[in-house]
């Protein structure tokens, strides 16, 4: 890593969940290959996701989430953000970065505000079809905005927005080389259930209940991989054991891209990283947007894939165990439909997003405007 890092330092700032950190990791991999020394500024939640960064290149910045209107809580929040600003300034004085790139989440506010106030070029990447609150607060200050699913040429900041897609990690690109092979009607059917990096309690209850309603000969075909929150792991595993269905249940899978490539069908939330990985690998999916998202970003992400014919989208409120069982049974017995969905999903994937985002980052470092970058990248 260090013998290549002759271009200078770039700091990536990301909230401590997989949805923010996975695209940051993908960009880091691309930038390192180009000779950049890449550091990560994040929060304490990030420890299980930051294996791609050397320990001395991970910097925990004090931060807090702005929520509610309680004056005392708000005062504590703004105090934490101010301390994070001081942390960031101290870090940047030492590292002297040529660029700071934000990937969303409130922990990006202190580093991006500090960088812009210090005259360091800044760039934010918005993974979702609807801009998150932290990025909204930064959009007016940064040099450029990169979008994953943002609508093209619309919004107040269209002039400085470039649609790059969402960078995916190298293991996703490896998994993308595995072609989709539909299961025959009597073959084993590999189902992947994925709630995003933080899991989904709803799936831990609803999927076993739906599987219990399947005819016995259909249950006998199932091989399930399911991500579940730690508090739901044992109950989900026991439910499948009682039904006689082989199931690998865990809070987190380090090899999720390979498991996705191995799946015949995916049931998932529709966070931006999840949808991006589904499209790059090319797998048929049922997407159930998280219903309590503040900006309904997951619904917008899911709609983008559904419009291409790559997924079915179902509201959680409409998904009874009975309906879920019917949809699962239909998927298991319509291999041609799933094959078409897989092709449609892959057709909208952007496997070169990390390259394009790195190109934009280097353009901003060199002093180019977004307009100059766009003109130089026209087909």
Curated annotation (Swiss-Prot):
It is an enzyme of class 2 (transferase). InterPro entries: GlcNAc_MurG, Glyco_trans_28_C, GlycoTrans_28_N. Its EC number is 2.4.1.227. UDP-N-acetyl-alpha-D-glucosamine binds at residues 17-19, 128, 169, 197, 298. The keyword Phosphoprotein does not apply. This is UDP-N-acetylglucosamine--N-acetylmuramyl-(pentapeptide) pyrophosphoryl-undecaprenol N-acetylglucosamine transferase. GO terms for cellular component: plasma membrane. It comes from Brucella suis biovar 1 (strain 1330). It catalyses: di-trans,octa-cis-undecaprenyl diphospho-N-acetyl-alpha-D-muramoyl-L-alanyl-D-glutamyl-meso-2,6-diaminopimeloyl-D-alanyl-D-alanine + UDP-N-acetyl-alpha-D-glucosamine = di-trans,octa-cis-undecaprenyl diphospho-[N-acetyl-alpha-D-glucosaminyl-(1->4)]-N-acetyl-alpha-D-muramoyl-L-alanyl-D-glutamyl-meso-2,6-diaminopimeloyl-D-alanyl-D-alanine + UDP + H(+). It is a peripheral membrane protein. HAMAP family: MurG (MF_00033). Pfam families: Glyco_tran_28_C, Glyco_transf_28. Keywords: Cell cycle, Cell division, Cell inner membrane, Cell membrane, Cell shape, Cell wall biogenesis/degradation, Glycosyltransferase, Membrane, Peptidoglycan synthesis, Transferase. GO terms for biological process: carbohydrate metabolic process; cell division; cell wall organization; lipid glycosylation; peptidoglycan biosynthetic process; regulation of cell shape. It is found in: Cell inner membrane. Cell wall formation. Catalyzes the transfer of a GlcNAc subunit on undecaprenyl-pyrophosphoryl-MurNAc-pentapeptide (lipid intermediate I) to form undecaprenyl-pyrophosphoryl-MurNAc-(pentapeptide)GlcNAc (lipid intermediate II). Belongs to the glycosyltransferase 28 family. MurG subfamily. The keyword Aminoacyl-tRNA synthetase does not apply. Pathway: Cell wall biogenesis; peptidoglycan biosynthesis. One of its GO terms (molecular function) is UDP-N-acetyl-D-glucosamine:N-acetylmuramoyl-L-alanyl-D-glutamyl-meso-2,6-diaminopimelyl-D-alanyl-D-alanine-diphosphoundecaprenol 4-beta-N-acetylglucosaminlytransferase activity.
């Amino acid at each position: 890593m260090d013998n290549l890092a002759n271009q200078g330092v770039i700091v990536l700032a990301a909230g401590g969940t997989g949805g923010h950190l996975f695209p940051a990791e993908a960009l880091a991999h691309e930038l390192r290959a180009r000779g950049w020394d890449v550091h990560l500024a994040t929060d304490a939640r990030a420890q299980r996701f930051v294996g791609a960064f050397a320990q001395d290149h991970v910097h925990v910045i004090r931060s807090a989430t702005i929520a509610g209107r309680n004056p005392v809580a708000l005062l504590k929040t703004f105090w934490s953000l101010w301390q994070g600003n001081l942390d960031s300034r101290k870090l940047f004085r030492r590292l002297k970065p040529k660029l700071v790139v934000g990937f969303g989440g409130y922990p990006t506010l202190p580093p991006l505000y500090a960088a812009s106030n210090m005259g360091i070029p800044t760039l934010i990447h918005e993974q979702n079809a609807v801009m998150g609150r932290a990025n909204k607060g930064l959009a007016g200050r940064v040099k450029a905005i990169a979008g994953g699913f943002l609508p093209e040429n619309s919004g107040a900041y269209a002039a400085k927005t470039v649609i790059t897609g969402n960078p995916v990690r190298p293991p996703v690109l490896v998994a993308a080389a595995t072609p989709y092979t539909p299961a025959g009607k009597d073959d084993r059917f590999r189902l992947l259930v994925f709630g995003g990096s933080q899991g989904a309690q709803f799936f831990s209850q609803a999927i076993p209940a739906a599987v219990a309603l399947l005819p016995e000969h259909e249950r006998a075909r199932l091989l399930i991989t399911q991500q579940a929150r730690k508090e739901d792991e044992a109950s989900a595993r026991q439910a499948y054991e009682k039904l006689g269905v082989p199931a690998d249940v865990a809070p987190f899978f380090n090899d999720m891209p390979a498991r996705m490539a191995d799946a015949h069908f995916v049931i998932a939330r529709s966070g931006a990283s999840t949808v991006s990985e589904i499209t790059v690998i090319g797998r048929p999916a049922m997407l159930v947007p998280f219903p309590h998202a503040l900006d309904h970003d997951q619904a917008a992400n899911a709609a983008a894939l559904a419009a291409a014919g790559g997924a079915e989208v179902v509201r959680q409120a409409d998904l009874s165990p009975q309906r879920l069982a019917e949809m699962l049974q239909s998927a298991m017995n319509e291999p041609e439909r799933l094959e078409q969905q897989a092709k449609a999903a892959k057709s909208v994937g952007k496997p070169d997003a990390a390259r394009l985002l790195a190109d934009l980052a280097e353009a901003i470092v060199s002093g180019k405007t977004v307009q100059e970058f766009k003109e130089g990248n026209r087909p």
